[in-house]
Amino acid sequence: MTVVNAMPTYKDIAYASASPTQKLDLYLPEGDGPFPVVVDVHGGFMMGDKSNPAGTDELLANGYAVASVDYRLSGEAKAPAQIQDIKAAVRFLRANAGEYKLDPERFAAFGQSAGGNLVALLGTSCGVEALEGAVLGNADQSSCVQAVVDWFGPTDFLQMDQQFAGTSCPANHDDASSPESQLVGAPIQTVPDKVQFVNPITYVSAKAPPFLIQHGTADCNVPPQQSQLLYDALVSAIGADNVTLTLLEGASHGGAQFSDAANMQLVLDFLASNLK
């Protein structure tokens, strides 16, 4: 995991009031703005927090504001509360863009693992009312984003154990105690409709923004085929020029191959080309 050296410019901003969890930290680069925004979503579903957003030092050095968002974990609320929180955070930031020197027209989302699922869902479900959570505030604002960086996020939970078949990786996502089952409130294979409700592929359309998807070939937490499924669906909808899938040979569920300078440059180049 990359250690963030920067300190938040604003810490624990409440973006909604339904839960004390609904807070974000905002990191601003030097200058007067308005700054393009990268909304960082942590992994975990069941655990984790906003304290260590990925690539923040590099993003700040390149002129991006970073909003690191906490969301209700599955022990507090079941899906779709998590994506509704992320959308509420985006709407809050747009509504208060002037105060925080943000550019409301240039928003990207960046997430790892469970956060990858949530940013992919954020990207594909623009305008989907059932996932919006408008009651959380700023309903007049858009929650759409202009680019998505998805690091090893799961997509179709129902296929994960099948995709691990024949490998040395544990196939335990169908278990009642798995993060995915805890997210939807039941063993995933017993509630396929709930699972598809939070599958970003469900909402892929020609309206989807450009995506950079990265996954390690040796990931034993989320099968790399999960990213391939999303990539294939996006290519069909928005064209191969707007979607990049990078499979990092030998990389596991995160690690140095994602956060090293060469790979972070790929992320920065992608953001620069899509947040002009």
Role assignments for model-derived ranges:
Residues 33-35, 41-78, 129-131, 158, ...:
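Short substrate-entry loop that stabilizes the transition state in hydrolases
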Residues 220-229:
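Conserved alpha/beta-hydrolase "acid-adjacent" motif
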Residues 212-215, 219:
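Short beta-strand/loop motif that positions the catalytic acidic residue
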Residues 251-261:
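Catalytic histidine-centered segment of alpha/beta-hydrolase-like enzymes
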Residues 2, 159-203:
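Mobile cap/lid helix-loop segments that gate and shape the active-site cleft of serine hydrolases
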Residues 1-32:
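N-terminal cap/lid segment of alpha/beta-hydrolase-fold proteins
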Residues 77-98:
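Alpha/beta-hydrolase active-site loop
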Residues 91-165:
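Primarily recognizes the serine-hydrolase "nucleophile elbow" in alpha/beta-hydrolase
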